Curated annotation (Swiss-Prot):
Belongs to the influenza viruses PA family. The lineage of its organism: Viruses, Riboviria, Orthornavirae, Negarnaviricota, Polyploviricotina. Its EC number is 3.1.-.-. Signal peptide: none annotated. It is an enzyme of class 3 (hydrolase). This is Polymerase acidic protein. It comes from Influenza A virus (strain A/Pintail/Alberta/119/1979 H4N6). One of its GO terms (biological process) is viral translational frameshifting. The gene is PA. A motif (Nuclear localization signal 2 (NLS2)) lies at residues 184-247.
């Protein structure tokens, strides 16, 4: 039978049938009759829809030889053969756009002419018996049923056969041929007898062999077999008294379930200590760009050429001097490193042909800044496993830090609009199916709201820096390569613009494992005076390197230009994630999409357009000490994006732990708000788990303070 199926049906149909069976844990090699039945059903569904179109006037027509220029729409949308999630998405989309009632079971087709879903049946028994089983199962007035048999009979709801005589005859002929082919090979009788009725009751799943033994071994105490455990679980009343249930399950558990009331939760305790400091891999709100508009110089697009061109736009360079030293570092080395960059860039310009990359001379200041020869010597484990007092270093607990106001300002800035666009609208082909049309519309609206957002600039900057650094780490492992920090954007007028934020010099990078570290020194331009918030710049040495003329309302003013220099490090895995920061756009789009879906399901139609275009409506953005902040839909998009971007920029184990543990408390509080009378045990343990993540990370501390604002307002 299996060979017959593979010869008799189109390979695409065979592949879809195999996939469907595997999804339900069935083997096409063993359940061959079922394999044949699924292929037959798929083929009938495809034949049902083949050649049927709707023309420009909305009339149903049959076109057999394809005229590629005709603007035709398929009359039938096929759900059968798609994977379940996709099929349901199509069904939901059709229901939203046409207003048709959503079916309980996944139908096979949708007819755009008659505006109804169709359930196709193919039976080896009497058509009317099978028709009744189908109707009984789906219990829906709205879904049209059409049954075919292998003997040429058919039956349809209200004797409305949907298709013309000829199209149906094609299907019946094909079924008759399949039957004859099977009969000639002696396969028909077994196939005919193997058809079971529509299963409307859940079957008991029999467990045998190893699985049975494992099931018996893994029962909770006091249960002798899987059957009596199953009976116990089936009789479990969900809203009964939990303590009793727990003690019934195991003698060891004695949890007192405490009711969780408005007065129960306390705010999270934020740590004390000096204010937290900036720890991102590059400057955010404090960054300054040297830019060129409409770049058309020779070698445009080669980072080094672009960087030199940007440097030439600034004329206010002066003798650099240290204005905010790094507490622990050898500050003159940072100063010398910057002077060396300037000198070596100058050297490049004096050469005939500018090289594509530039490796710095390995001077003592760079060796120091990049930690050259600082790594402890590695010893083979074989040589030291006999050492009696072998132990890991005692590492000190990190010092706690308190929340500082700068991180909230950073976040606010990330939500703002800039005057440039940082992402282009992707060119994606024409939409064909209704779901694609909705998806494109959402994507375009969302892109319009976030393309100018500063968080989007951070994404593109992060992608660029991480890509360049990973490339250089692999291509020039031993060299101290200079990597310009560049981004590209478009101005309001649509002119292209290339921006230089500063430079990175990378250290030796023999990265074997994902977590092996490459050190780098970053040097970034800024107009921010570090003496205003010295705690923010604890890890930096800041130089004053020039004076910049700025146009203001009162005319030109001269501002000192600073260079923020620090030693930093990253790893292959961190760079890999940094290169994929564009995912943040997707994550925040999906969050917005779930808001649209919620609106749409209430209104029972797609609400995308109204959602984005109703400018008067405000949406909750977040909690602050003042209460629930609200804003336009654009502001919501940008805030969600900024959160996602900061989760990437400030990724850390503290953030992972805080997000996972605080979510549990959040769910309990939400249950209380929804009057679900939640109960908890060991709430103290949960607080401990959350608070052990509040150490010194600025982004985690800010999220914890937001969480406290949420608690205050949620429990009023």
């Amino acid at each position: 039978m299996e060979d017959f199926v593979r010869q008799c049906f189109n390979p695409m149909i065979v592949e879809l049938a195999e996939k469907a069976m595997k999804e339900y844990g069935e083997d096409p090699k063993i359940e061959t009759n079922k394999f044949a039945a699924i292929c037959t059903h798929l083929e009938v569904c495809f034949m049902y829809s083949d050649f049927h179109f709707i023309d420009e006037r909305g009339e149903s027509i049959i076109v057999e030889s394809g005229d590629p220029n005709a603007l035709l729409k398929h009359r039938f949308e096929i759900m059968e053969g798609r994977d379940r999630t996709m099929a349901w998405t199509v069904v939901n989309s059709i229901c939203n756009t046409t207003g048709v009632e959503k079916p309980k079971f996944l139908p096979d087709l949708y007819d755009y002419k008659e505006n109804r879903f169709i359930e196709i049946g193919v039976t080896r028994r009497e058509v009317h018996i099978y028709y009744l089983e189908k109707a009984n199962k789906i219990k829906s007035e709205k879904t049209h049923i059409h049954i075919f048999s292998f003997t040429g009979e058919e039956m349809a709801t209200k004797a409305d056969y949907t298709l013309d005589e000829e199209s149906r005859a094609r299907i019946k002929t094909r079924l008759f041929t399949i039957r004859q082919e099977m009969a000639s090979r002696g396969l028909w009788d077994s196939f005919r007898q193997s058809e079971r009725g529509e299963e409307t009751i859940e079957e008991r799943f029999e467990i045998t062999g190893t699985m049975r033994r494992l099931a018996d071994q893994s029962l909770p105490p006091n249960f002798s077999s899987i059957e009596n455990f199953r009976a116990y679980v089936d009789g479990f009343e969900p809203n009964g008294c939990i303590e009793g249930k727990l003690s019934q399950m195991s003698k060891e558990v004695n949890a007192r379930i405490e009711p969780f009331l408005k007065t129960t939760p306390r705010p999270l305790r934020l740590p004390d200590g000096p204010p937290c400091s900036q720890r991102s891999k590059f400057l955010l709100m404090d960054a300054l760009k040297l830019s060129i508009e409409d770049p058309s110089h020779e070698g445009e697009g080669i980072p080094l050429y672009d960087a030199i061109k940007c440097m030439k736009t600034f004329f206010g360079w002066k003798e650099p001097n240290i204005i905010k030293p790094h507490e622990k570092g050898i500050n003159p080395n940072y100063l010398l490193a910057w002077k060396q960059v300037l000198a070596e860039l100058q050297d490049i310009e004096n050469e005939e042909k500018i090289p594509k990359t530039k490796n710095m001379k390995k001077t003592s200041q760079l060796k120091w800044a990049l930690g050259e020869n600082m790594a402890p010597e590695k010893v083979d484990f074989e040589d030291c496993k006999d050492v009696s007092d072998l132990k890991q270093y005692d590492s000190d607990e990190p010092d706690t830090r308190s929340l500082a106001s700068w991180i909230q300002s950073e976040f606010n800035k990330a939500c703002e609009l800039t005057d440039s666009s940082w992402i282009e609208l992707d060119e994606i082909g024409e939409d064909v199916a209704p779901i694609e049309h909705i998806a494109s519309m959402r994507r375009n609206y969302f892109t319009a709201e976030v393309s100018h957002c500063r968080a989007t600039e951070y994404i593109m900057k992060g992608v660029y820096i991480n890509t360049a650094l990973l490339n250089a780490s692999c291509a020039a492992m031993d060299d101290f390569q200079v990597i310009p920090m560049i981004s590209k954007c478009r101005t309001k007028e649509g002119r292209r613009k290339t921006n230089l934020y500063g430079f990175i010099i990378k250290g030796r990078s023999h990265l074997r494992n994902d977590t092996d570290v490459v050190n780098f020194v970053s040097m970034e331009f800024s107009l921010t005076d570090p003496r205003l918030e010295p705690h923010k710049w604890e890890k930096y040495c800041v130089l004053e390197i020039g004076d910049m003329l700025l146009r203001t309302a009162i005319g030109q003013v001269s501002r000192p230009m600073f260079l923020y220099v620090r030693t930093n490090g990253t790893s292959k895995i961190k760079m890999k994630w940094g290169m994929e920061m564009r995912r943040c756009l997707l994550q925040s789009l999906q969050q917005i999409e779930s808001m649209i879906e919620a609106e749409s399901s209430v209104k029972e139609k797609d609400m995308t357009k109204e959602f984005f275009e109703n400018k008067s409506e405000t949406w909750p953005i977040g909690e602050s000490p003042k209460g629930v902040e609200e804003g336009s839909i654009g502001k919501v998009c940008r805030t969600l994006l900024a959160k996602s971007v900061f989760n990437s920029l400030y990724a850390s184990p503290q953030l992972e732990g805080f997000s996972a543990e605080s979510r549990k408390l959040l769910l309990i509080v939400q249950a209380l708000r929804d009057n679900l009378e939640p109960g908890t045990f060991d709430l103290g343990g949960l607080y401990e788990a959350i608070e052990e993540c509040l150490i010194n990370d600025p982004w985690v501390l800010l999220n914890a303070s937001w969480f406290n604002s949420f608690l205050t307002h949620a429990l009023k």
